[in-house]
């Protein structure tokens, strides 16, 4: 099968969130099953042309009355046969930032930028004389792709090509002024028919939900949640209408990177039978953060974007957040790695100065993120909503028991602790509040000090979990086949 991925993020070239990891890992998993997978993405400012191969001849892309000339570069995903085509346009992509910058969080010309990507994706296929069986578009930034396939390319060489659209996070929809609609390259007559119209604005995600042959999202529970107003972000009606075409497929984990027995970032590698090595990583983590080195005290780790979705108000809010009370009342240590909202960064620094058992690192550090997973005993992830989540799966594989809210992919991957039997793989909050976080952390700490056999049993079970991409790839192939069948029935 010939599969074209269109994405705004791709590891190792550009990453803002888990989207980048997911598209890379899925593409490689499909290629390993002998499918011809190619990825189209922008060549951002930080992607050096010197490391890419230029494809001769510029391409003309028409957006409204304007003609844009774009270049194309080529490379491969590391250690794979997956080709990556980079759309090169200095005005659109020759700047720092994927969607925005520190000075402009959401670029004002994003409609034009990502419309250019969508149109260019089809032009690249023509240029390479390669017509895919399926176009798989990821998140709002690629939302125009299924629209073009349905309305603009329906009588071209792409007439038999099916579309699949994956929702990685309903909270990000690509909503812009109606006056930018001509930048999509569509006619004003298409404003309503394409699904772009959203309360007198344009909405890339909505257009994709309306136009795609099949829809997926990144966990079974999230597929159910987004059909409800609480999690649907105003799109729940469309998703209920299209529920037969919507499939939830749990993301996998790249176990070549996240594997405690092979992890190159941690000082002591281990497995479920050598957990004493995990304790050595704990001592290194404590020393690294300037905490008292004491393996008898449980360490609670957290790696997160510091945004409202992640439950930061309930955990770190200066007025009612539970972190200060947790660290004051319970014998434990807490380490946090992340960046995001300025008030939260300031609060974390304040807690680090005020509390001897709390430390933070503002920013991101790959080596430190692996050490936190390996050296912590518990992992905090009290998300308000979580489409899939990766860190709870990393934590399970590392024997670091997650503390999560029952939502989305967290509900699909973490089994709540049973005090009587010792079964489970983590600790689950039924609802999100400062008190529920406090109670659940206290529950975990109680088990640590009083139920050592249960902790060991849970760790062993957690580390036996399988989160490879092979299962997810098979499920996506089924969705692709359904999309092709649906497209054929409409011809």
Curated annotation (Swiss-Prot):
Alphabetically ordered keywords of this record: Glycogen biosynthesis, Glycosyltransferase, Transferase
UniProt-listed Enzyme Commission number(s): 2.4.1.21
InterPro entries found in the cross-reference section: Glyco_trans_1, GS/SS, Starch_synth_cat_dom
Pathway(s) of this molecule: Glycan biosynthesis; glycogen biosynthesis
Taxonomic superkingdom: Bacteria
Residues that coordinate or bind ADP-alpha-D-glucose: 15
Keyword Repeat: no
Single biological process term from Gene Ontology: glycogen biosynthetic process
GO molecular function: alpha-1,4-glucan glucosyltransferase (ADP-glucose donor) activity; alpha-1,4-glucan glucosyltransferase (UDP-glucose donor) activity
Catalysed reaction equations from the record: [(1->4)-alpha-D-glucosyl](n) + ADP-alpha-D-glucose = [(1->4)-alpha-D-glucosyl](n+1) + ADP + H(+)
A Pfam family hit: Glyco_transf_5
The family this protein is said to belong to: Belongs to the glycosyltransferase 1 family. Bacterial/plant glycogen synthase subfamily.
Family matches, as HAMAP family: Glycogen_synth (MF_00484)
Function noted in UniProt: Synthesizes alpha-1,4-glucan chains using ADP-glucose.
Protein's name in the database: Glycogen synthase
Origin species: Treponema denticola (strain ATCC 35405 / DSM 14222 / CIP 103919 / JCM 8153 / KCTC 15104)
Lineage: Bacteria, Pseudomonadati, Spirochaetota, Spirochaetia, Spirochaetales
Name of the coding gene: glgA
């Amino acid at each position: 099968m010939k599969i074209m991925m269109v994405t705004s993020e791709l590891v190792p070239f550009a990453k803002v969130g888990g989207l980048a990891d997911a598209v890379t890992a899925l593409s490689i998993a499909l290629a390993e099953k002998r499918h011809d997978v190619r990825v189209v993405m922008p060549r951002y400012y930080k992607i050096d042309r010197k490391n890419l191969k230029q494809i001769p001849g510029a391409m003309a892309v028409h957006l409204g009355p304007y003609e844009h000339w774009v270049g194309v570069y080529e490379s491969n995903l590391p250690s794979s046969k997956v080709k990556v085509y980079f759309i090169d346009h200095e005005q659109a992509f020759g700047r720092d930032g994927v969607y925005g910058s520190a000075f402009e969080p959401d670029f004002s010309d994003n409609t034009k930028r990502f419309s250019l990507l969508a149109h260019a994706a089809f032009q690249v296929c023509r240029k390479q004389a390669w017509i895919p069986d399926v176009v798989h578009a990821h998140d709002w930034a690629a939302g125009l792709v299924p629209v073009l396939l349905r309305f603009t390319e329906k009588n071209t060489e792409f007439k038999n090509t099916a579309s699949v659209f994956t929702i990685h996070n309903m909270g990000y929809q690509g909503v812009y002024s109606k006056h930018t609609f001509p930048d999509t390259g569509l006619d004003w007559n298409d404003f309503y028919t394409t699904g772009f119209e959203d309360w007198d604005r344009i909405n890339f995600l909505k257009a994709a939900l309306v136009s795609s042959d099949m829809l997926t999202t990144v966990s079974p529970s999230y597929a159910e949640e987004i059909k409800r107003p609480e999690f649907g972000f105003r799109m729940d009606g469309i998703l209920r209408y299209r529920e037969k075409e919507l499939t939830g497929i749990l993301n996998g984990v790249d176990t070549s990177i996240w594997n405690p027995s092979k992890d190159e970032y941690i000082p002591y590698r281990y497995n479920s039978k050598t957990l004493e090595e995990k304790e050595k990583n704990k001592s290194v983590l404590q020393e690294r953060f300037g905490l008292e080195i004491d393996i008898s005290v449980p360490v609670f780790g957290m790696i997160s974007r510091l945004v409202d979705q992640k439950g930061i108000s309930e955990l770190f809010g200066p007025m009612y957040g539970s972190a200060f009370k947790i660290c004051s009342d319970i014998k434990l240590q807490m380490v946090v790695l992340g960046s995001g909202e300025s008030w939260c960064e300031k609060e974390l620094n304040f807690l680090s100065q005020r509390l001897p058992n709390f430390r933070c690192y503002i920013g991101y550090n790959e080596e430190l993120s692996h050490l936190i997973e390996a050296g912590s005993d518990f992992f905090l992830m009290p998300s308000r909503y979580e489409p899939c989540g990766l860190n709870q799966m990393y934590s399970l594989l590392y024997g670091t028991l997650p503390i999560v809210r029952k939502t989305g992919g967290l509900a699909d991957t973490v089994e709540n602790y049973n005090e009587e039997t010792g079964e489970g793989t983590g600790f689950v909050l039924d609802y999100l509040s400062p008190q529920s976080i406090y109670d659940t952390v206290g529950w975990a700490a109680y088990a640590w000090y009083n139920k050592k056999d249960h902790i060991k049993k849970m760790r062993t079970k957690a580390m036996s979990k399988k989160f490879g991409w092979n299962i997810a790839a098979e499920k996506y192939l089924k969705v692709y086949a359904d999309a092709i069948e649906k497209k054929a029935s409409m011809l």
